[in-house]
């Protein structure tokens, strides 16, 4: 294979805390093993998470030069795996914002999906830390980013890129207002 794009993993802090050994084995050790098997000509495009930034800074958005300070096992395994990948000469890493979009197996633990579920079920929402910001990216934009990386690999290689939508860097309160447009009885 010319390109290796590892997408398997245990995703999210709650699941990784519940299945610690599996999280380390799948999110970190499997990536380490995969990188060790690559030929010098092969190229790897890795998908990390913006969870590696931890809580970040309240004054500014995190960029690729922001310090990595993961606060969960999930974030730590992804950061450590990225370090391994980026030691490989032919590598690119995307630090993904929270991915959203239709799935056959919807994750109701994700903030956006959880807010929609609660609003449909309970017809009301109690918002904790309403000014907390999250950045989002649609799954089709992630796919477009990976395709772009394949076609522009030599220009992008050996670098890390945040992949998210500027317009989707919103507070919980702003998110609830958007949900309210579609769920009238909220």
Predicted regions and their residues:
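Conserved beta-loop-beta element that borders a ligand/cofactor-binding pocket
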Residues: 48-49, 82-103
